[in-house]
């Protein structure tokens, strides 16, 4: 079981997504699966990022609602670093 840590950016991003009317239980469900060390089902399109973000992973909570996260195995920590739309997170 991983301990979940939230960056300040993640906290702000989550507040914004809640304000936009997103079902936050979906985010909680994904985080709980990840914290339990389970693989996400294929519909979440979980994948490793590349380039400057190569140490992070991304999954799709909804088609345009993403979660960026990172595992730290040395202390069994899952760090949630951001959530939002593609535009919010990557400026695209």
Language model: regions and residue ranges:
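Enriched for short, Lys/Arg-rich terminal
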Residues: 3, 9-12, 19-24, 50, ...
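Secondary-structure boundary motif
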Residues: 16-19, 36
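N-terminal hydrophobic or amphipathic segments with adjacent small-residue motifs
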Residues: 31, 45, 76-78
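A short, surface-exposed loop/turn module that caps and links secondary-structure elements
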Residues: 33-60
């Amino acid at each position: 079981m991983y301990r979940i840590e939230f960056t300040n950016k993640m906290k702000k991003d989550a507040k914004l997504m809640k304000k936009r009317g997103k079902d936050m239980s979906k985010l909680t469900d994904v985080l709980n699966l990840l914290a339990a060390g389970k693989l996400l089902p294929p519909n979440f399109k979980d994948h490793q990022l590349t380039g400057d973000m190569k140490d992070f992973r991304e999954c799709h909570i909804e088609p345009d609602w993403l979660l960026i996260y990172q595992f730290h195995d040395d202390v069994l920590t899952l760090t949630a670093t951001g959530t939002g739309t593609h535009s919010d997170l990557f400026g695209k």
